[in-house]
Amino acid sequence: MSISLNYSATRDPLSALGLDVGNRRIGVAGSDRLGLLATGLGVIQRRSLSEDIAQVQEWIRRRQATVVVVGIPLLADGSVGSQARKVQRFVRALQVAVDLPIVTVNEYLSTAQAEWDLREAGIPAKAQKGLIDQQSAAVILQTWLDERRASLSEVPAWQSWGNKDYAGEV
């Protein structure tokens, strides 16, 4: 089964919701209406798939999201491991539940980037624990926003990361 999760870049205002789906928590981030900046918004404590999807739907409603961006934790070589397969299952369930484009991006090293961002912001290590998931979601969403902006400005492909669909087949 293959899922098409493309979202065409336009110059229209957007409200993107970014998700970092983990085993215990889902980090949530949102974009500004211009699609320039991603900000961590909060964390969903995972309970069951149906409850998790309902919580995401509530975030979508509150933020009036027009697209959802989900990080897929590919391995260093770009292959799909067990954690990526779990996230792919979540993405398929979310696709059934919401009538919005869902885009996936490779989230490789997003947690490391989030930890670095928090450290650079002067957040003590103990305080980072509660913020890391939402900051990871912000890193994932910012990656997509940057790729989208590059495609809108018609930057040559070699200058942008490109926008791949990592939902794959399971």
UniProtKB/Swiss-Prot annotation:
Annotated localization: Cytoplasm
Pfam families referenced in this protein's UniProt entry, alphabetically: RuvX (PF03652)
Gene Ontology biological process: rRNA 5'-end processing
SUPFAM superfamilies associated with the record: Ribonuclease H-like
Family the entry assigns: Belongs to the YqgF nuclease family.
PANTHER family, sorted: POLYNUCLEOTIDYL TRANSFERASE, RIBONUCLEASE H-LIKE SUPERFAMILY PROTEIN
Protein name: Putative pre-16S rRNA nuclease
